[in-house]
Amino acid sequence: MAAGQQIIFIDGDTFPHREWVADHMKSAGERHVLCGRRVKLGPRLSPSVTAQDIEAGKFDSAFSPMILKSMLAGDTQRLGLGVRVPRPIARVLHPRPRKLMGVNFSLPKSAFVAVNGYNEEWRVYGHEDRDLELRLIRAGYPRKALLNRAVVFHLHHPERERSEETMRLIQAAEESRDVRCDRGYDLEEAFDPLG
């Protein structure tokens, strides 16, 4: 169970900019769901990324030679989202809320608990964050964009197709009026996707 008052989420196929946690915490509020995005590193650059590169600061700037070369070769996408700008400028550039993406978001623990977190009945790949987002909206938790602030780099991998079951679950979530899921954060034992 999370001990802090703000919960920050990231995917296992990504790595954050060194200021990522600070960016989320500086923008945190009592009710806001903070929605970041990702720079999509390409299939040629991703296998060559090392922990040493990250620790050496080679991803501290979107304009580093390693990233620029990859972008100019058509390998890396959404590089503009990797440019960190001061908060007042980011708010002017991105005034409207963005969709919640599980790869990069944070929210008050109280909001997560209020909607009972992720729905553990959602046992198919992908888009479980859409269900969570809809319940947070229904519960009155506004979204706030963190584009050009909380930067995350996504390592390339083949994408999976949305299954019919996933599409059915998304449609059911969109048609529902539920704020809380039945099987979520309050479970004693969470769903283990590995079995």
Model regions: which residues?
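Short, flexible, basic/aromatic active-site loop/helix in glycosyltransferases
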Residues: I54-P97
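Terminal low-complexity segments of carbohydrate-biosynthetic enzymes
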Residues: V103, R138-P142, S163-G195
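Active-site-proximal specificity loops/subdomain of glycosyltransferases
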Residues: M1
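The conserved acidic donor/metal-binding loop of glycosyltransferases
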Residues: D11-F15
